[in-house]
Structure formats: structure tokens, C-alpha cells
Curated annotation (Swiss-Prot):
Binding locations of a divalent metal cation: D8, D9, S40, N93
PANTHER family xref list: 5'-NUCLEOTIDASE SURE, 5'_3'-NUCLEOTIDASE SURE
EC numbers, comma separated: 3.1.3.5
Name the record gives this protein: 5'-nucleotidase SurE
Function in brief: Nucleotidase that shows phosphatase activity on nucleoside 5'-monophosphates.
């Protein structure tokens, strides 16, 4: 089985090294094509105005000056064009990709691009608690220990062609995980996102996008609830964003001819 791995934290990120070990536990045919620098939050962006620069690190490791989406396309349509991957893995992200995070996530986008290209794809993210050492105290062993078995089972069961799997590992050591939950995508309180104004040394303003802690109870059956209970959240996401009930309702309610505005 040929595996292509990527991420959004960059070629030197510790989570990518974790994912290389996860992939190596499943296959000896593993290729890495990852961004040259941190691409967190770039979502599914594609480089159309700048050329892609490819740096070959070794026969199986490459860095691309581009986004996670660029990396997957480069891997599938160029580096591995003679024999495309059987699986795309994206991650392991340093931090959660839960709820509406999936809209912004380069990690999830890397897996989505794999799915669009017709390859079973999985995004992996390792949660951490900001108040307990933050990134420096992240429990990478949680993903490293549990991911291989979950991925193997998913491949045996089969992943639908229009679906990308989003895995989030709770902020705890592997030994403290309480189980695996198949979940729905959650929803946070939108008021938690804010602008944090600052001032530089010359007195000029600059700004950070910041997030406050969401104090609401997570929805039942969601990815947010699962990781709060120290369970691994497995969320199937669709590439097709069509809302079928709304499509049906509007098709039935709108007139067959173009409505005219009185004026």
C-alpha cells in the first residue's frame, strides 16, 4: 500500500514526524510531500498566482513552497504520477480541528484534496489543553498509539468516495483515552472569536484574531463532546456541501419562471 502524507504545520513539524511513524506502521511505501513553512489556517486554498517550488529532501521526502492542497496535487499529479497513492494522510496537526475548525483547517483540506482526487483520505489532529503546558506539553503518543489501528479498520471497512475522515485525538496520554466515538461535526459559540488590538514600537496599531474559551456544554454526539470525554472523535465529512432538504424545499416553493421585482 502506497501512502502519501502531508500536513499544514510544515515539513519540520513534530506532528509530521509522528505521522511518518504512524504511516510506517501500516506500510513500507510512504512518501512525504509537505509545505516548506507553516500553513495553518489556509483552508483549501490553491496557489494560482505564484509558481510552486519543490525541494527534494530525499527520495521519499519533499517540501513544497505552497499550501497543503498544493502538496497533495504535487504528490499525486507529479511526484507519484506513475503510481498514485492508495491512501492520503494529513497531519498530525498540533491542535484540534473540531466543529467549524474544519472550514479553516489546512490539515483537513489536505485530506479533502486527496478525496477529490479519488484517494481514500484521513485528517489527524492532536488536541492539547492551553492551560497545561500548551503545545510544549502535547501528548503526541495519543495519536501515535491509537491511529494505526483505527486507520487499518477504516481501510478494511471502506471509506465512501465522497467522504473524508476527520480524526481528533483528545488532550491526554494514550493510556487515558476512554474510547472511540463516531461523531457529528459540532458547533461553537460564534461570539468566542474576537479581534485583539495591539500597538507596535512606533505606536502603530496591529491586530491578532483571538479566541475565547467556549463555556457552553458541547452538543450531544458531537466531536466537541467526544474529546471533552477523552474519547477519539471520528467524524465523516462530505465533499458535497449541498443541503438536500433546503434544495428540495426551494425547488418546491420557488416559481418556475424568474420572479420579478416591482419597481
Amino acid at each position: 500500500m502506497r501512502i502519501l502524507i502531508t500536513n499544514d504545520d510544515g515539513i519540520n513539524a513534530p506532528g509530521l514526524a509522528v505521522l511518518e511513524r504512524i504511516a510506517s506502521a501500516l506500510s513500507d511505501d510512504v512518501f512525504v510531500v509537505a509545505p516548506e513553512s507553516d500553513q495553518s489556517g489556509v483552508a483549501h486554498s490553491l496557489s494560482l498566482s505564484d509558481p510552486l517550488r519543490l525541494r527534494k529532501i530525499s527520495d521519499r521526502r519533499f517540501a513544497v513552497k505552497g499550501t497543503p492542497t498544493d502538496c497533495v496535487i504535487m504528490g499525486v499529479r507529479s511526484i507519484l504520477i506513475e503510481q498514485k497513492p492508495d491512501l492520503v494522510l494529513s497531519g498530525v496537526n498540533c491542535g484540534q480541528n473540531l466543529a467549524e475548525d474544519v472550514i479553516y483547517s489546512g490539515t483537513v483540506a489536505g485530506a479533502m484534496e486527496g478525496t477529490i482526487l479519488g484517494i481514500p483520505s484521513i485528517a489527524l489532529s492532536q488536541c492539547y489543553e492551553a492551560g497545561t503546558g500548551g503545545r510544549s506539553g502535547i501528548a503526541w503518543d495519543c495519536a501515535e498509539v491509537h491511529a494505526p489501528g483505527i486507520i487499518k479498520h477504516l481501510l478494511e471497512t471502506g471509506i465512501d468516495p465522497d467522504v473524508v475522515i476527520n480524526l481528533n485525538f483528545p488532550a491526554c496520554p494514550a493510556s487515558e483515552v476512554t474510547g472511540l466515538a463516531v461523531t457529528a461535526q459540532g458547533r461553537r459559540d460564534a461570539t468566542t472569536i474576537k479581534i485583539d488590538p495591539r500597538q507596535d514600537g512606533r505606536g502603530l496599531p496591529y491586530y491578532w484574531i483571538a479566541f475565547a474559551r467556549d463555556t457552553r456544554q458541547p452538543g450531544v454526539g458531537t466531536d466537541l463532546e467526544a474529546v471533552a470525554q477523552k474519547r477519539i472523535a471520528l467524524t465523516p465529512l462530505r465533499i458535497d456541501l449541498t443541503d438536500d432538504p433546503t434544495m428540495t424545499r426551494l425547488a418546491q416553493s420557488l416559481p418556475k419562471t424568474l420572479p420579478k421585482v416591482a419597481g
